[in-house]
Swiss-Prot record:
An MF annotation (GO) of this entry: structural constituent of ribosome
Function: One of the early assembly proteins it binds 23S rRNA. One of the proteins that surrounds the polypeptide exit tunnel on the outside of the ribosome. Forms the main docking site for trigger factor binding to the ribosome.
GO biological process: translation
Gene3D superfamilies: 3.30.70.330
InterPro entries linked to this entry: Nucleotide-bd_a/b_plait_sf, Ribosomal_uL23-like, Ribosomal_uL23/eL15/eS24_sf, Ribosomal_uL23_CS
Keyword vocabulary terms for this entry: Ribonucleoprotein, Ribosomal protein, RNA-binding, rRNA-binding
GO cellular component terms listed in the entry, alphabetical order: ribonucleoprotein complex; ribosome
Subunit structure: Part of the 50S ribosomal subunit. Contacts protein L29, and trigger factor when it is bound to the ribosome.
Name of the protein: Large ribosomal subunit protein uL23
Name of the encoding gene: rplW
Pfam families attached to this UniProt entry: Ribosomal_L23 (PF00276)
């Protein structure tokens, strides 16, 4: 059993892009930015608890931070993790929350 306080720290927010919008419409898949150390089981449990939906599958990937130059120095952005969460048939997550 995963502790509730850990579940609240797993999901950092939705990842909104053209690709994620198309996936949401066609495949009932939602994309989230998640903690870099989060497991698929934790992500599945967190989405199920926070949004009260049934989750079919979770796919994850780690985006490597880009190298950027500032002045004469070379820096690097942080790595971050993205999760593609496929919801069960009929399940839906409304991020807007009643806006018309």
């Amino acid at each position: 059993m995963i502790r509730e306080e850990r579940l609240l720290k797993v999901i950092l927010g939705p990842h909104i892009s053209e690709k994620s919008t198309v996936l949401a419409e066609k495949n009932n898949t939602v994309v989230f930015r998640v903690a870099i150390d989060a497991t698929k089981a934790e992500i599945k449990a967190a989405v199920a608890k926070l949004f009260e939906v049934e989750v079919d599958s979770v796919r994850t990937l780690v985006n490597k931070g880009k190298t950027k130059r500032t002045g004469g120095r070379v820096g690097r952005r942080i790595d971050w993790k993205k999760a593609y969460v496929t919801l069960a048939a009929g399940a839906e997550i409304d991020f807007v929350g009643g806006a018309e």
